[in-house]
Amino acid sequence: MDSPFLSIIVPVYNGESWVTPAVDGILSQTRPSFELIAIDDASRDATSNILTECCREDSRIRVLTHKTCLGAGPSRNDGMDIARGKYLLFLDADDLFEPNLVESVATEAERIDADMVLFGADEFETEGEWRSNRFFLVSDLVPAAAPFNRNDIPNRLFQLCTPEPWTKLFRRDFAMENGLRFQGLQNTNDMLFTLSGLALAARVGAVPDVLVHHRVGRPGSIQASRGRDSLAFLAALRAVKQRLEVEGLFDQLAESFANLVVFHCLFNDDAPASWAEVFAELGVSGLPEHAFWLDGDYERYTRLVLASWEEGNGLACAYGKDFWYKAALLERADLERSAQRADELQRRADDAWRETELVKASLSFRVGSTLTAPIRKLRER
């Protein structure tokens, strides 16, 4: 059997209410050269029956079944281990997808022979509220020329996108050769995989379009089924730092990593006994103000260093509210740039029209038209 261009890996836990629309959205992609690997992570509902029926209807689907719930990270690893595609795409079983998702990312991957391709997403709640999230892919930071890599954006590499795997395409050989694996953490189990990949990739591309619609606020997900460790993100950050040090990349990416650490510490729901000790351990102590990407983060960082446990929690709560304000600012900036580009294109079109009218009105144009009229009539015959 010929290998597919792409392996789409989808972990599922108790997804009877959501998995069918997700699978339908994948199978209806405009570019059909892919396999779908669904990992049933010991679901206790009708998920297994639904996936079995899907397999009967479409030969591109393969199903792995776990006897015990392992979590999203190990499930993705298991799917990756049996994948046959040239590229890997990790999607969630409760999300929705644009029909050109595969075609868009595959086209960019082929165009630049990419190790990774980043793309946009937004969010929606089951009740119907939709919202954009420009942090999934910050178009301001994407280098103009593709492919790009860490050398083009060392101080803001990890601010280019969030760590979620479902906004990224990976070349399978690149992932396997570099030993990229998802952690078995209860949450934040994707950070080591995606950010190590971003740091190591030699050829990265980006598709600015929103191609995934991510469902939020749903109970019963894989992570929810295994409980939540609110400080698991610290283990993930430690692992990322260690990988960067092993690869000799930490110094080059230190400023971007520091922003990553501060962002996640401020946005987290809980606090360790001492943020100062955490920052020291992760190598982000004594940061100057100019090192921070987002306005106000330096002030919050300095306050967090001195904060007690209770104060740290309060800062995190306030930052969470401010996060969506910043996301809205990024979206407004995108819209303003789009409007500016539209104005510039309109100005060029107007200039071209005026130049054309001036040419038509010129004596040389009128004389030339008169002289060539007989020839044009002969051609029309």
Model-predicted regions and their roles:
Residues P4-S7, E35, L192:
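Cell-envelope/extracellular polymer assembly enzymes that use nucleotide-activated donors
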Residues D24-S33:
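Short, acidic, metal-binding catalytic loop of nucleotide-sugar glycosyltransferases
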Residues I26, D41-A42, L70, A93:
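Conserved short acidic donor-positioning loop in nucleotide-sugar-dependent glycosyltransferases
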Residues D40-I50, T68:
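A conserved acidic beta->alpha catalytic loop
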Residues H66-A83, L96:
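Glycine-rich, basic loop-to-helix element that forms the pyrophosphate-binding segment
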Residues A72, A93-V207, V212-D229:
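Donor-binding/catalytic cores of nucleotide-activated saccharide
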Residues L88:
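Short aromatic/hydrophobic "clamp" motif used to bind/position activated sugar donors
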Residues A307-R381:
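Boundary detector for helix-to-coil junctions that initiate low-complexity/charged tails
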